Structure formats: structure tokens, C-alpha cells
């Protein structure tokens, strides 16, 4: 009877060990396998052919699902690790895009949408790619397709990775009005306890349709803000911070007519795992299983003593 109990407990322990390993197992990415990206530009069943599309490669992807900024983007003070929300993805997209535009970086690939408003990029290596926004002008107004970041292949915990991806960027329609619009630039600091590390000023380039049209200094005396008035003609405005202070990362976002530049102290930035060295869960699972079995054995032993 005693041997039977121990055999049963041992079998249960093995089952418990195997189940968590399946749940937490990392599905490796075949970084040598070619990827493709098809992008569709359409709105309310209306296709937009003849649109010039640029593709930037911003980060390398590794077999364990981590990535690292590379190429022209390698030195950008932008954190792409630990992103968990759509808001954070939009922040990373707009910030990387502002650097690409301000520095006039050369796209990795370029092309034009076909009659169906689609474009296909083939034979891409695994990595993170940036597609800038597209402004399509029409007789009934402007159609603005949002910029986006895409990881090829997208992360998958279970099953096969998807190496051929189709994306349809979000689009909004607007009618330019001949009126003056005020834009405001605001600098925000997320560095509690490190306020003394802030510089006296920061330099910001302001871009109109990808071209730098003014450079502005933001200081404490100006409350880290700047505003300008322009005629609303549907132009795309962007901002990019130059000479980001050491120890900080930056995000550039826009809400309505307000541009927000946020400097975050790097001490709180999530670092990626070492390449080829993904997080390992099985030692913790093994400890929990052994502890559970030990408690079961202890309970059985105590009941036998009582009897």
C-alpha cells in the first residue's frame, strides 16, 4: 500500500512537471526563413492606388522573440522593450518615425500601391519594420493612413509563427478648412528623484511634411512649452528632440493639436533578455511541484500517526 501511494505521487509529480513546461515553452522563431508584408490602403471600399510607400527596418529579431534597434535606428534614445499596450506601440511608432523624417533616413524598401491599393514587400528577414503614414488627397478631402510598427513574424506562444503578414492601417477622413490652427509643444519629465539631472534646455526640430521648418529651445523659464500658429492645409506636423540628455529615453506623441515630448529616466526601462538566453521557468515549476508533493506526503504521514 505504501509503495502504491508513493508511486501515485511520483506519477502526479511528473504530470505536473510536464504541463507547466508546455504552457511556458518558448516557440522559437526561424530567423532564416523569409517573411513578407502586404499592406492595404483602402477606406470605405475605396482603394488608393499609386501611393508611394516606404518601409524602414528598425530592429533585428532573434529566435527567442526579443529584438534590438539596428541600422540607422540603433542609436536612437527610444525604448522598444517591455511594450504591452497599443498606446506604447503608438508612442514608439511616432518617435521612431520622427527621427526617420528629421534625419532623412533612407528607406529599406520603397514601392507604389497597385490598382487595389495594395503593396507587397517580399523576402524580408525577421525583424521590426516601420511604415510611415500616408496622406492621400482627394476631391472630397484628405485621407490620412496612420503609421505603424510591425514585427515579422508576430510573436506566437503556441502554434506556428506567421511569416506572411497582411496589414490594413487605420484611416481617417478630413476636410481642410482655411483657418488658422494653433499647435502646442509640451516637454514632460518622468524622472522622480532625478530632477537635478535635467538639462537647462532641450532642442526640438519641428517638421512639416517631413521637412524641418523651425528649431526651438525649450527651457524651464518657458515652462518647457512652445506654440505656433499656421494655416490648416492638411500638412503633417512632427516634432523630434535633439541631444536627448544622457540617461533618458524619449517618446513623441500627439493628441489633437498638442505634441508631447516625454523624457523618461532610463533607470526604469525594461531591458531585453540576452540574445539566445530566454527566461527559464522550469526550475521554479520544479521547486513548486516538489514542495507540493512533500506537503502531500507529510499530510499522509500525519494521518497514519493519528490512526
Outline where the language-model segments fall.
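Solvent-exposed loop/turn and edge beta-strand elements of beta-rich ligand-binding domains
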Residues: 2-307
Amino acid at each position: 500500500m505504501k509503495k502504491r501511494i508513493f508511486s501515485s505521487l511520483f506519477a502526479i509529480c511528473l504530470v505536473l512537471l510536464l504541463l507547466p513546461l508546455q504552457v511556458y515553452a518558448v516557440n522559437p522563431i526561424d530567423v532564416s526563413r523569409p517573411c513578407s508584408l502586404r499592406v492595404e490602403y483602402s477606406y470605405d471600399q475605396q482603394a488608393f492606388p499609386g501611393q508611394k510607400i516606404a518601409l524602414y527596418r528598425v530592429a533585428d529579431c532573434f529566435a527567442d522573440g526579443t529584438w534590438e534597434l539596428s541600422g540607422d535606428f540603433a542609436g536612437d534614445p527610444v525604448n522598444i522593450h517591455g511594450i504591452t499596450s497599443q498606446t506604447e506601440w503608438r508612442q514608439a511608432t511616432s518617435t521612431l518615425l520622427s527621427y526617420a523624417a528629421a534625419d532623412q533616413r533612407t528607406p529599406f524598401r520603397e514601392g507604389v500601391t497597385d490598382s487595389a491599393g495594395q503593396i507587397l514587400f517580399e523576402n524580408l528577414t525577421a525583424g521590426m519594420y516601420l511604415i510611415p503614414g500616408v496622406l492621400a488627397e482627394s476631391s472630397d478631402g484628405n485621407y490620412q493612413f496612420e503609421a505603424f510598427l510591425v514585427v515579422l513574424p508576430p510573436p506566437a506562444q503556441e502554434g506556428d509563427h506567421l511569416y506572411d503578414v497582411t496589414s490594413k492601417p487605420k484611416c481617417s477622413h478630413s476636410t481642410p478648412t482655411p483657418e488658422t490652427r494653433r499647435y502646442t509643444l509640451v516637454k514632460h519629465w518622468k524622472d522622480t528623484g532625478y530632477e537635478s539631472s535635467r538639462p537647462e534646455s532641450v532642442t526640438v526640430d519641428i517638421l512639416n511634411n517631413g521637412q524641418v521648418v523651425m528649431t526651438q529651445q525649450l527651457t524651464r523659464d518657458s515652462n518647457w512649452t512652445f506654440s505656433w500658429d499656421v494655416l490648416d492645409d492638411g500638412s503633417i506636423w512632427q516634432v523630434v528632440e535633439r541631444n536627448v540628455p544622457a540617461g533618458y529615453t524619449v517618446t513623441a506623441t500627439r493628441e489633437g493639436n498638442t505634441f508631447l515630448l516625454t523624457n523618461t529616466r532610463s533607470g526604469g526601462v525594461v531591458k531585453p533578455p540576452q540574445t539566445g538566453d530566454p527566461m527559464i521557468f522550469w526550475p521554479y515549476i520544479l521547486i513548486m511541484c516538489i514542495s507540493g508533493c512533500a506537503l502531500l506526503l507529510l499530510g499522509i504521514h500525519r494521518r497514519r500517526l493519528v490512526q
